[in-house]
C-alpha cells in the first residue's frame, strides 16, 4: 500500500515538481508485491526509495544529468543500491540531479513554491521526499548537495562522515570530497535508516542520552542574515534546555581560507574525472560547466 500510495502521489504531482528522471511503475509494483509475499528479511523491507541519477542501477538508465549518457544502462548496481535491495527496499526510480552533480540545474522545482529553487545538486531526491512522493531518497554531496536542498525543501538531510558509505558505482566528481547521503522527513526516519546502514542500535551509543553538539559560528557568520542567526541561536537554547551539552567551537584563522581551498580541489578533481567528457563530448556539456575549465 505504501508503494502504491507513493506512485499515486507521483502521478498527481510530478508535472508540478519534476523530481524524477526515470520511473518504472510496473517494476516498482512487482518489487512491492514480491515484498508482500516474502517474509521480511531486511530492515527496509518494502520501503520505497528514490535514487539520485548519478548512482548506477542495473535495471534502470543512469544518465548523470547529462545528454551524453542518455539511455546509458549500467551493468551493475552501485554499492549503495545493492545494499538497499539487500535490505528489502523497493527502488521506485531515479531522481533528477544537476549535470554531473555540479551547477547546471535540472527540471525540478521546489514543491512548496515552483518559483523557488529546490537546491542542488540532489534536487529530485530532496523535492521528492518533501512532496511525499517517497519517504527515503539517496543523494550525494561534494559541497552542499545534501544539506542545501534539504534546507530549501524543508526535509531532513543526512551527510555522514566522508568515507562511511561506499561511493563505488557513483559517477565521481571530486573523489576527495564526494559523500553519499540521504533525505527523510523526520529524525525518527533517519534513526531507522542509520540503524539499517550501520547495523547499530541506539543502546550501543553510550553518549546517546547526553550528546555533545559543537556550536561554530565560522568566519562567515556575519554573512548570514538576522533570521538565520536567530534560528541557530534559538536551536542552541532549545538543545541546552533539553540537557544537551553545547560546546563553543572557535576555528583557527587558517580555516578562513577553507572555502577557497575546497573550490580549488573540487575544480581540479572534476577536471580529472570529466576528462573523457571534456575531450570527446565537449559540445554536449553545458556552457557553465565548460567555463570552469576554460579559465
Question: What do the predicted segments below correspond to?
Answer:
Residues 1-73, 101-102, 232:
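Short, well-ordered alpha-helical
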Residues 6, 28, 190, 213, ...:
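Residue-level signal for inorganic ion chemistry
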Residues 44-64, 210-212, 264-295:
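Short helix-loop capping/hinge segments that flank enzyme active sites or metal/cofactor-binding pockets
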Residues 46, 179, 195-264:
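Gly/Ser-rich, acidic/histidine-flanked active-site/gating loops
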Residues 50, 68-72, 178-185, 293-295:
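Short, well-ordered beta-strand elements within core beta-sheets of diverse protein domains
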Residues 76-194:
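Short glycine/serine-rich loop segments
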Residues 106-113, 258-273:
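Charged, often glycine-rich, active-site loop that binds/positions anionic groups
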Residues 187-198, 271-276:
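Conserved core segment of the aminotransferase class I/II
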Amino acid at each position: 500500500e505504501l508503494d502504491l500510495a507513493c506512485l499515486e502521489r507521483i502521478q498527481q504531482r510530478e508535472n508540478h515538481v519534476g523530481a524524477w528522471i526515470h520511473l518504472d511503475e510496473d517494476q516498482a509494483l512487482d518489487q512491492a508485491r514480491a515484498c508482500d509475499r516474502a517474509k521480511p528479511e531486511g530492515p527496509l523491507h518494502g520501503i520505497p526509495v528514490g535514487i539520485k541519477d548519478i548512482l548506477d542501477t542495473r535495471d534502470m538508465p543512469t544518465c548523470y544529468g547529462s545528454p551524453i549518457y542518455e539511455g546509458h544502462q549500467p551493468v551493475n548496481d552501485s554499492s549503495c543500491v545493492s545494499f538497499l535491495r539487500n535490505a528489502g527496499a523497493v527502488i521506485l526510480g531515479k531522481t533528477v540531479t544537476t549535470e554531473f552533480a555540479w551547477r547546471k540545474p535540472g527540471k525540478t522545482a521546489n514543491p512548496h513554491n515552483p518559483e523557488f529553487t529546490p537546491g542542488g545538486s540532489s534536487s529530485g531526491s530532496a523535492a521528492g521526499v518533501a512532496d511525499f512522493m517517497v519517504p527515503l531518497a539517496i543523494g550525494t554531496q561534494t559541497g552542499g548537495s545534501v544539506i542545501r536542498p534539504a534546507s530549501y525543501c524543508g526535509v531532513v538531510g543526512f551527510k555522514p562522515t566522508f568515507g562511511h558509505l561506499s561511493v563505488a558505482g557513483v559517477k565521481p566528481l571530486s573523489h576527495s570530497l564526494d559523500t553519499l547521503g540521504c533525505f527523510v522527513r523526520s529524525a525518527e526516519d533517519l534513526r531507522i535508516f542509520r540503524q539499517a546502514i550501520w547495523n547499530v542500535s541506539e543502546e550501543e551509543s553510550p553518549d546517546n542520552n547526553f550528546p555533545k553538539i559543537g556550536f561554530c559560528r565560522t568566519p562567515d557568520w556575519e554573512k548570514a542574515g538576522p533570521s538565520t542567526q536567530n534560528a541557530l541561536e534559538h536551536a542552541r537554547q532549545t538543545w541546552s534546555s533539553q540537557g544537551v551539552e553545547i560546546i563553543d567551537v572557535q576555528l583557527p584563522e587558517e580555516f578562513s581560507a577553507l572555502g577557497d581551498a575546497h573550490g580549488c580541489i573540487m575544480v581540479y578533481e572534476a577536471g580529472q574525472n570529466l576528462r573523457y567528457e571534456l575531450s570527446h563530448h565537449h559540445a554536449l556539456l553545458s556552457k557553465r560547466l565548460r567555463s570552469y575549465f576554460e579559465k
